[in-house]
From Swiss-Prot:
GO terms for biological process: actin filament polymerization; angiogenesis; antibacterial humoral response; antimicrobial humoral immune response mediated by antimicrobial peptide; defense response to Gram-positive bacterium; hematopoietic stem cell proliferation; innate immune response; negative regulation of apoptotic process. This is Angiogenin. It comes from Saguinus oedipus (Cotton-top tamarin). The gene is ANG. Belongs to the pancreatic ribonuclease family. One of its GO terms (cellular component) is cytoplasmic stress granule.
Length: 146
């Protein structure tokens, strides 16, 4: 029994070593995308929301000039990378078929060092993302829907 567990553990460890690095890197880039741009708890952020979220997400050293938070379901955002909720756009990017509630946080200017202050613009927009292996890894832009 003990020998069987050791063998099973060895096979597991070897399997981890054989995991393609690109898959792990894609997960890392996708998780970074979520950290920078995903907030399902808010619908429309204001200036205080931007100040707080940019600080909580560690985007203030130096102050990031602009950042967009998407307020939607994670599955709907991932679906932009497929045909369910995305269409090809401007080369290798994907544009969402449906609009998302977003909050765009723009640095008010001044010093690039904290404390950073942001102005919020909230609304419904289509988003454009770059995808790798079916996952969004970069938010390129948001497009206002007339």
């Amino acid at each position: 029994m003990v020998m069987g567990l050791h063998l099973l553990f060895l096979v597991f460890i070897l399997g981890l070593g054989l995991t393609p690095p690109t898959l792990a890197q894609n997960d890392l880039r996708y998780n970074r995308f979520l950290e920078e741009h995903y907030d399902p708890k808010t619908k429309n952020g204001n200036d205080r929301y931007c100040d707080k979220m940019m600080r909580l997400r560690n985007m203030i050293s130096p102050c990031k000039a602009i950042n967009t938070f998407i307020h939607g379901k994670k599955e709907s955002i991932k679906a932009i990378c497929g045909t369910e909720n995305g269409v090809p756009y401007n080369g290798n990017k994907r544009k969402s078929k449906s609009a998302f509630q977003v909050t765009i946080c723009k640095h008010r200017g001044g010093s690039p060092r904290p404390p950073c202050q942001y102005r919020a613009t909230a609304g419904s927009r289509n988003v454009v993302v770059a995808c790798e292996n079916g996952l969004p890894v970069h938010l390129d832009e948001s497009i206002f829907r007339p």
